[in-house]
Amino acid sequence: MWLNLREKLQSKTVRIEHPEVYECKFCGSDQIMRYGKKTKQLKQRYYCKACKKTFVIDTITRRMWFDPKVVTMTLDLYYKGVSLRGIQDHLNQIFNVQLNSPQTILNWIKKYEELIGEYVKTLKPTLSGQWQVDEMKVKFKGNWKWLWNVMDRHTRYLLASNITKKREAEDARKILALAKEASKGQKPEKVVTDGLHAYKDAFNKEFFTLRKPRTEHISHIRLAGDMNNNLIERLHGTKRDREKVMRGLKTEETPIVPMQDIYYNYVRPHMSLEGRTPAEKAGVGVEDQNKWLGLVKKSLEASRRPVLDNPN
């Protein structure tokens, strides 16, 4: 499988495109020529015959140490299930990019989780009105904990994820509160959960009101029909597959879980959505073919701050 993936990536990703440059950034002359690439960074360098200076084109990603497509391809490979060392080997063989250690990739994940995470929090997805809530066990340094998820049924948009040590009412309430915050004031018509008693107390504290219309809590899951939790259980299956490659999460503060949610919402196409992402279905998707790069660009534009990828 890895060999097939490598061949596919080789044919698709070795051509790193660069924007056309027509004049020197220093003197404005059109007497410019391509002048190789910056060492290990795969960024196109240009030489001006008029002023004898070399330069690299300025773009929205001008402060990224490595070529943005290399960085975003690395993120994509990781969330498609390739191990850190597998990615390190791929970058070396295909792009001649030599990373000192796999930790560099984790540093990229942390850096871009912060950047992209801040951006997506500002977006308001258009939701269907039915939320599905569930929890699953995950491992942190050999200890089992609980990963909670809330998904909008029809868009498949993942509203919130949270990790807790226990599975009590306050833990259930926390995930519902996070989902309400992410919905930007959109009140669900129904909240579907399993029969865990903690959900009843949590739901009443977060959603109960005397005013109509009221949000309905559906906690008895039937084996068939519109109200079952099969969709979010499929999401858990996806996360378990990713966990096998991650070999257990390392700490609650890891950026891997938030980035996995970003990958699920904004990057990964869904067959049930006719090849669209949940974000596209919810009206907040990225149009770029390279979804990761599109997210980075939009995040940089929104934050107006540089991001460095210096591995040292």
Which role fits each region the language model picked out?
Residues N143, Y199-K205:
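A short acidic (Asp/Glu
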Residues V245-N312:
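C-terminal domain-tail junction helix/linker
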Residues M33, K43-W131, E135-K141, T155-Y157:
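Short, positively charged, Gly/Tyr-enriched micro-motifs
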Residues N143-N149:
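Short glycine-rich loop/turn motifs
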Residues M64-F66, K111, S161-K184:
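Active-site beta-loop-alpha junctions of metal-dependent nucleic acid enzymes
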